[in-house]
């Protein structure tokens, strides 16, 4: 059974998977004993998702690998129609734009669907609309924000995108690789206020072409801010209608 899981590259296995490998019923005593023994020996590690385990293959030894996507994969395996995406700093690290992983990853979910205790245990969960996390490409079987979506993440949820005041923030590297047309297409789904913030952030990180492409999507002048509403205004873009209370790229 262990060899089969390794051959097929399984990193998340369910109770049903183990039962199938053993050729027993899911409610059998033999199955329960086998899972208990596999956990004891370090081959399986229980996940927060009910009935799911992380498989720890022999090539790495029976020790946890620290895969940040394993809980998200387990939730999707159990609920294939569940809409989620890894966003912000965690996505930036996984996509290779930042060198440091966050202490805790953030996951956006469609607010219209039921919640997930497993996700809330493993991640910072942001509830949003389905269209804001649609079409995010998969990375290792989990949707993870790519370059254009990372800019939208920063505009929508600045707190999960690191310190945007840093002039050498990873967004600068993201913007250098970004397709302006792709960013503009995503801005159409983000809403007027977020679109204005996307354009402003791109401009602050010296990407005028991306900023202009996004700004063209605006049909009305926005009235929005970046940062806490009670904080003083650091900068203001009258054309976009953005008050910067955070100080994007000022340090």
Residue map of PLM features:
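Short beta-edge/loop segments at beta->alpha junctions of small alpha/beta modules
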Residues: 1-81, 176-196
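A residue-level signal for conserved active-site and pocket-lining positions in enzyme catalytic cores
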Residues: 18, 91, 151
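Residues in well-ordered beta-strands of folded domains
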Residues: 45, 54, 108, 124-126, ...
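Exposed, interaction-prone assembly regions rather than primary DNA-binding/catalytic cores
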Residues: 83-136
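Hydrophobic alpha-helical interaction segments
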Residues: 132-251
